[in-house]
Amino acid sequence: MSTKPEKPIWMSQEDYDRQYGSITGDESSTVSKKDSKVTANAPGDGNGSLPVLQSSSILTSKVSDLPIEAESGFKIQKRRHERYDQEERLRKQRAQKLREEQLKRHEIEMTANRSINVDQIVREHYNERTIIANRAKRNLSPIIKLRNFNNAIKYMLIDKYTKPGDVVLELGCGKGGDLRKYGAAGISQFIGIDISNASIQEAHKRYRSMRNLDYQVVLITGDCFGESLGVAVEPFPDCRFPCDIVSTQFCLHYAFETEEKARRALLNVAKSLKIGGHFFGTIPDSEFIRYKLNKFPKEVEKPSWGNSIYKVTFENNSYQKNDYEFTSPYGQMYTYWLEDAIDNVPEYVVPFETLRSLADEYGLELVSQMPFNKFFVQEIPKWIERFSPKMREGLQRSDGRYGVEGDEKEAASYFYTMFAFRKVKQYIEPESVKPN
C-alpha cells in the first residue's frame, strides 16, 4: 500500500511527483475534464464542488437570447454594478493610501528596532471596514460567491461539532456574522469577543434586529490572544464557563505573531473548554503557503502571489534563504489583500504541526483538519436540501455545480483549511510560568 499523502488539488502532478516520487499503475490514471461527463449521481469533482442535475442552462444563456424584459434587467444590473465599482474604487484608493501610510510608519519603527503593533493595525482596519460596510450593496460585492462559500463552510463546521443547548465562545467574533448559524444549531448561550469595538457595536445591532433567536448573547470588546480572557469577561457575570465550544474563524493567524501570543491563545481556549468540548476554526493553509513560496528562487526579495481577488506578499525572502524552511514557527509575517474585504493587513503563517503540538500541550486532541475544498465536497451532500434556495443559488457555479470557481477558488477553496480539536484532559498551569 502506498504511503504517499493524498495529492492536494492545488498541487500539480509534476510537483507532486518531484516531491514524493513518480507514480505508476492505477495511481497515475487521470481523466481529462474536457473529455469527462458529469452525471447527477457523481459524488463531486474534488475541487470543492458538487455536480447537480442539468440546471445550469438558464445561468449560461446569453443576454441576446433572453426576452426584452430580461435583457433590460441585465442592463439595470450592469449599471448598478458600474456605480458600485466606481464607489468601491474611490473607497479603496482612500483605504489603500491610509494603509500605505500606516505600513510605512511601521516599517520605520522596525528599522528603529521597535516592534510593529499589529493589534492596532488589525483593530483600525476592522473598525474602518465596519464603518464603510453597506449591507444594502452586499449582493453587488465582487466576492459575493466567495462569501457564500465561506459561510457554507462555517454552517457545516458549526453543525458538525455543536449540539443543542451548548454554550459557545467565539474568539474574534467580528460583527456577529455567525449568530444565525448558531441559532440554527439550537445553542443556549453565545459569548462573542473581538478586539474591534466597532465590530462589537455592529454585532449588537445585528443581534437586536434578528428575530427568533432564543438563546442568550453576550458581546464583549477584548483581546482574545494577547491577554487572559478573564480580563475581558470579568465584568460579564452572565457568561457560563466552561463552554462546550470555542470557535475562531479567520483570525487565529494573528496569534502567531509570537510564541507568547500563540500560547496565550491556546491557554485561553483550554481554560474555557469543558472536557469533551470542541475547539474548531478556519486558518490559512500553511502547506499551500509553503507550496507557493517554494516556487520562488532565492533572488526574489519579496515573494508575492495572487490574482484579481486576493494577494499575499512576504516582506523578505528569509524562507528561501533558509533552504526553503521558515526560520521560526512564529512571526512569519505577510500582508494580505482581499477584494472588497481586507486591505493589506499583516497576518502570520500558522504552521499546522506547530498548532497541533501546542494544542496537545494544552490537552487538546486533533479530530480533523482538511482544506476547504475537501471539507466542502465531503459535507455538501448533507446540505443541499438543508440550505435555503437563496443559499443554494449563491453557491451555484456557472457550470451548475456547487462551490467556487475562477479566481475565487484559489482565494477560498485552496488558501484556507478547517480544523477541529477535542479537549481530552485538564491543563494544569505551572505556578512558576503563570502569566500575569
UniProtKB/Swiss-Prot annotation:
<comment type="similarity">
    <text>Belongs to the class I-like SAM-binding methyltransferase superfamily. mRNA cap 0 methyltransferase family.</text>
</comment>
<feature type="binding site">
    <location>
        <position position="223"/>
    </location>
    <ligand>
        <name>S-adenosyl-L-methionine</name>
    </ligand>
</feature>
<dbReference type="InterPro" id="IPR004971">
    <property type="entry name" value="mRNA_G-N7_MeTrfase_dom"/>
</dbReference>
<feature type="binding site">
    <location>
        <begin position="150"/>
        <end position="151"/>
    </location>
    <ligand>
        <name>mRNA</name>
    </ligand>
</feature>
<comment type="function">
    <text>Responsible for methylating the 5'-cap structure of mRNAs.</text>
</comment>
<feature type="site" description="mRNA cap binding">
    <location>
        <position position="347"/>
    </location>
</feature>
<protein>
    <recommendedName>
        <fullName>mRNA cap guanine-N(7) methyltransferase</fullName>
        <ecNumber>2.1.1.56</ecNumber>
    </recommendedName>
</protein>
<feature type="domain" description="mRNA cap 0 methyltransferase">
    <location>
        <begin position="141"/>
        <end position="424"/>
    </location>
</feature>
<feature type="region of interest" description="Disordered">
    <location>
        <begin position="1"/>
        <end position="50"/>
    </location>
</feature>
<feature type="site" description="mRNA cap binding">
    <location>
        <position position="416"/>
    </location>
</feature>
<dbReference type="InterPro" id="IPR016899">
    <property type="entry name" value="mRNA_G-N7_MeTrfase_euk"/>
</dbReference>
<dbReference type="InterPro" id="IPR029063">
    <property type="entry name" value="SAM-dependent_MTases_sf"/>
</dbReference>
<feature type="site" description="mRNA cap binding">
    <location>
        <position position="175"/>
    </location>
</feature>
<dbReference type="GO" id="GO:0006370">
    <property type="term" value="P:7-methylguanosine mRNA capping"/>
</dbReference>
<dbReference type="InterPro" id="IPR039753">
    <property type="entry name" value="RG7MT1"/>
</dbReference>
<dbReference type="GO" id="GO:0003723">
    <property type="term" value="F:RNA binding"/>
</dbReference>
<keyword id="KW-0506">mRNA capping</keyword>
<dbReference type="Pfam" id="PF03291">
    <property type="entry name" value="mRNA_G-N7_MeTrfase"/>
</dbReference>
<feature type="binding site">
    <location>
        <position position="194"/>
    </location>
    <ligand>
        <name>S-adenosyl-L-methionine</name>
    </ligand>
</feature>
<keyword id="KW-0489">Methyltransferase</keyword>
<dbReference type="GO" id="GO:0004482">
    <property type="term" value="F:mRNA 5'-cap (guanine-N7-)-methyltransferase activity"/>
</dbReference>
<feature type="site" description="mRNA cap binding">
    <location>
        <position position="253"/>
    </location>
</feature>
<feature type="binding site">
    <location>
        <position position="249"/>
    </location>
    <ligand>
        <name>S-adenosyl-L-methionine</name>
    </ligand>
</feature>
<dbReference type="GO" id="GO:0005829">
    <property type="term" value="C:cytosol"/>
</dbReference>
<keyword id="KW-0539">Nucleus</keyword>
<feature type="binding site">
    <location>
        <position position="154"/>
    </location>
    <ligand>
        <name>S-adenosyl-L-methionine</name>
    </ligand>
</feature>
<feature type="site" description="mRNA cap binding">
    <location>
        <position position="206"/>
    </location>
</feature>
<feature type="binding site">
    <location>
        <position position="172"/>
    </location>
    <ligand>
        <name>S-adenosyl-L-methionine</name>
    </ligand>
</feature>
<keyword id="KW-0507">mRNA processing</keyword>
<keyword id="KW-0694">RNA-binding</keyword>
<keyword id="KW-0949">S-adenosyl-L-methionine</keyword>
<dbReference type="GO" id="GO:0005634">
    <property type="term" value="C:nucleus"/>
</dbReference>
<feature type="binding site">
    <location>
        <position position="254"/>
    </location>
    <ligand>
        <name>S-adenosyl-L-methionine</name>
    </ligand>
</feature>
<keyword id="KW-0808">Transferase</keyword>
<feature type="site" description="mRNA cap binding">
    <location>
        <position position="181"/>
    </location>
</feature>
